[in-house]
Design a protein with these regions (language model features):
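Short glycine/proline- and acidic residue-enriched helix-loop micro-motifs
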Residues: 57-73, 94
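Short secondary-structure boundary segments
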Residues: 37, 127-128, 157-158
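Small/aliphatic-rich secondary-structure junction motif
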Residues: 1-64
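Short, flexible loop segments at boundaries between secondary-structure elements
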Residues: 151-162
Length: 167
């Protein structure tokens, strides 16, 4: 029985398509829906650029407040995209969304950790990020989640591949 689901989004080009699947499944199963987006940690190059322009106090302030602001903005963007997608008649669907979480870390690990923490019954994600080429059979995050997920995974195929008929 599917009572709760975790929709993992990269906020990319195909996110609205995957979101439609997540909402339809939540509706079909009358299930709670959790949403997660992973923000990759800042790379060494970006960190060194910041260090060259900011003193230690400003850098610490950026890490504590700047990251929180970015995360809050992303969470709001996800909420807004759901509202946009649903229009005025989607209040009931919006109520299915229990939480939107933006967490820093490796995307596959964030998804797997949240699946375990929330005890969801199903994971929903796209087969590729928007940057992956259509010739790649499966994106890195999707492949890792499929290998290690403790629950079934609903994988939405890349729209461009479906249109061209490549399988």
């Amino acid at each position: 029985m599917i009572r709760s689901m975790l929709y993992a989004t990269d906020l990319g080009l195909y996110a609205p398509l995957v979101m439609q699947h997540a909402l339809a499944l939540a509706r079909t199963f009358n299930a709670d829906l959790y949403v997660v987006h992973a923000v990759e940690p800042m790379g060494l190059f970006a960190e060194s650029v910041l260090q060259s322009y900011l003193d230690e106090r400003a850098l610490n302030e950026f890490h504590s407040q700047g990251l929180n602001t970015v995360i809050a903005n992303i969470e709001q963007r996800v909420h807004d995209s759901f509202r946009e997608e649903l229009g005025g008649e989607g209040e009931q669907d919006l109520e299915r969304i229990q939480a939107v979480r933006v967490l820093q870390g490796d995307p596959s690990q964030v998804i797997l950790d949240q699946a375990q923490k929330l005890s969801v019954d199903l994971l929903i994600l796209g087969s590729h990020s928007h940057g992956a080429g259509a010739e790649t059979p499966l994106g890195r995050t999707a492949a890792r989640v499929l290998q290690l997920a403790p629950v079934p995974v609903y994988l939405v195929p890349l729209a461009e591949r479906r249109r061209r008929g490549d399988r």
